[in-house]
C-alpha cells in the first residue's frame, strides 16, 4: 500500500505534535514501510484511516504507544560518539563538579532523553565513576533516562547486555 503525499504530511505532522519527532519528506518511505503493518493489523484500508483511528478511536492511547515504537530509531551503544563523550568527561563534567563543590552542594542531576535500551545513561554512570573515583560516595547523583518506547525502557531497566552491545 502506497502513502500519498497528503497522507504522509498528515501523519508526519501528527507524529510531530504527539512526540516531537520530525520526519523529513525524503523519509516518506520510512513512514510507509513502518506503518503498513499497523494498518494491516488493525484491518484498516488506508493511511488516512489510520490517521483517523489515531485521532478518534477509543483505543488510540494504546495505538499511540505502538506508533511511537515503530517510528523511533533505537540506535545506541556504549561509549557512542567518543569525541562528544571526551569533551563531556574532560571539560564539561569537571567544570560542573567544580561549581557544585564551590557552592557546597555535591548534588548532580543528569537527564538522558531518548535513552533507548540504556547504553548512553550507563555510559554516563561509568564516566562519573571514573571521574569522581573515591569521592563518588559523597555525591548525590541521579541519572534520569527516558524514551518514548516502553519496550526499550524495559530493556534499559534490566541492564543486561550481550557481548555485541559491550
Located regions from the model:
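Conserved AdoMet
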Residues: 1-111
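Alpha-helical elements of the RecA-like P-loop NTPase motor core of helicases
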Residues: 86, 122, 154
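Conserved SAM-binding loop of SAM-dependent methyltransferases across substrates and taxa
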Residues: 117-136
Amino acid at each position: 500500500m502506497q502513502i500519498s503525499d497528503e497522507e504522509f504530511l498528515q501523519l508526519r505532522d501528527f507524529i510531530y505534535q504527539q512526540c516531537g519527532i520530525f520526519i523529513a519528506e525524503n523519509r516518506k518511505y520510512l513512514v510507509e514501510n513502518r506503518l503498513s503493518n499497523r494498518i494491516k493489523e488493525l484491518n484498516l484500508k488506508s493511511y488516512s484511516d489510520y490517521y483517523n483511528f489515531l485521532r478518534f478511536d477509543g483505543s488510540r492511547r494504546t495505538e499511540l504507544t505502538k506508533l511511537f515504537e515503530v517510528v523511533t530509531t533505537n540506535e545506541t551503544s556504549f561509549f557512542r560518539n567518543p569525541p562528544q563523550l571526551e569533551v563531556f568527561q574532560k571539560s564539561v563534567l569537571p567544570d560542573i563538579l567544580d561549581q557544585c563543590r564551590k557552592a557546597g552542594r555535591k548534588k548532580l542531576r543528569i537527564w538522558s532523553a531518548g535513552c533507548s535500551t540504556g547504553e548512553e545513561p550507563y555510559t554516563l554512570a561509568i564516566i562519573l565513576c571514573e571521574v569522581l573515583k573515591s569521592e563518588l560516595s559523597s555525591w548525590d547523583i541521579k541519572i534520569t533516562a527516558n524514551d518514548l518506547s516502553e519496550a526499550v525502557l524495559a530493556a534499559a531497566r534490566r541492564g543486561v547486555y550481550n557481548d555485541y552491545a559491550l
